């Protein structure tokens, strides 16, 4: 099979290569998937780059945790009726606090546990499906980890990003009123089109003042946070008493110093979101919800660009540059 690989961390153009690798076989409890689209998440790029001291955890890595395709074979213990099923995949490569799998979705074929290949919603194509594993499931967990959000007001920082854009739609579908923060006017349009009540330009507006104005001084029930270190003072200031901050990243500073009493005075709840560690029951609920929302056309996946496998290094650079209104996907 044709696959993208790397054997050392570093710049994309220097370490990623394309070549033939042995075809995998479906083992006990596994399915073999012909990959059609491979989603790229910031975590994939960080692993390849060696961000924050990350080391190679396997001698050779086929990158990318998310993808979509069709099942072409099954291993022992898996019903053969799954052959031909369109699926999206999660946790195909890597992980946090564990080495995880070595071989991800940036290849023509992948063998992985059957439960990690989920039936693709009828209304989504492979390119969209390749972004359900991390962006959409992280968004689901950030919105619903503590139950229903019906009637709540939610602030979503980074609302135009891959996770944020999904979170806006999932929260609105759940009955919440959403305020999103963005960094420019096109991003604001993108977020309002997804259903947000308001989109605030953090570069042009006093976000804290505007949130309190919009909520009549009450604040928000929940904050979904893309960069905890950068925004924790804001989050504490706009949070209602006993509200929750659900943070899924802190890239600007992996070891932020917490303003304890800003949160303690509100009786705040801090919820840290890790898409690789969603409890099994919650994951099944999330998978079912994403399918329902997608098939009801309440969830769309924004795509900024697609690249062929041969141009995977360019795709990684596109993710690193940031600012995309949508996901970057490698087609295979």
Where are these regions (language model features)?
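C-terminal hydrophobic helical "lid"/dimerization subdomain
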Residues: 1, 281-332
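NAD(P)H dinucleotide-binding glycine-rich loop of Rossmann-like/cofactor-binding domains
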Residues: 80, 90-158
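Short glycine-centered segments of the SAM/dcSAM-binding site in methyltransferase folds
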Residues: 86, 153, 177, 243-244, ...
């Amino acid at each position: 099979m044709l696959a993208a690989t790397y054997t050392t961390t570093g710049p994309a153009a220097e370490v990623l290569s394309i070549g033939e690798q042995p075809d995998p076989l479906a083992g006990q409890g596994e399915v073999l998937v012909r990959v059609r689209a491979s989603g790229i998440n910031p975590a994939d790029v960080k692993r390849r780059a060696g961000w924050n001291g990350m080391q190679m955890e396997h001698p050779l890595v086929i990158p990318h945790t998310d993808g979509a395709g069709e099942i072409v074979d099954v291993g022992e213990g898996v019903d053969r009726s799954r052959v031909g099923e369109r699926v999206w995949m999660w946790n195909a490569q890597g992980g946090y606090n564990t080495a995880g799998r070595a071989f991800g979705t940036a290849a023509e074929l992948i063998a992985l546990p059957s439960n990690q290949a989920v039936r693709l919603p009828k209304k989504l194509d492979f390119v969209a499906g390749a972004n359900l594993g991390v962006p959409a499931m992280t968004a689901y967990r950030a919105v619903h980890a503590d139950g229903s959000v019906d009637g709540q007001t939610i602030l979503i920082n980074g609302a135009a990003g891959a996770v944020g854009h999904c979170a806006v739609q999932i929260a609105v579908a759940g009955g919440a009123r959403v305020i999103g923060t963005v960094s420019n006017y096109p991003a604001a349009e993108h977020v309002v089109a997804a259903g947000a009540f308001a989109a605030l330009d953090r570069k042009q507006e006093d976000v804290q003042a505007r949130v309190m104005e919009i909520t009549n001084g009450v604040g928000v029930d929940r904050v979904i946070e893309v960069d905890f270190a950068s925004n924790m003072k804001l989050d504490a200031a706009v949070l209602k008493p006993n509200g929750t901050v659900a943070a899924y990243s802190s890239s600007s500073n992996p070891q932020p110093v917490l303003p304890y009493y800003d949160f303690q005075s509100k009786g705040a709840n801090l919820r840290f979101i890790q898409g690789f560690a969603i409890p099994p029951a919650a994951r099944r609920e999330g998978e079912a919800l994403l399918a329902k929302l997608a098939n009801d056309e309440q969830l769309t996946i924004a795509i900024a660009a697609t690249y062929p496998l041969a141009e995977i290094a360019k795709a990684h650079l596109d993710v690193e540059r940031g600012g995309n209104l949508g996901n970057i996907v490698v087609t295979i």
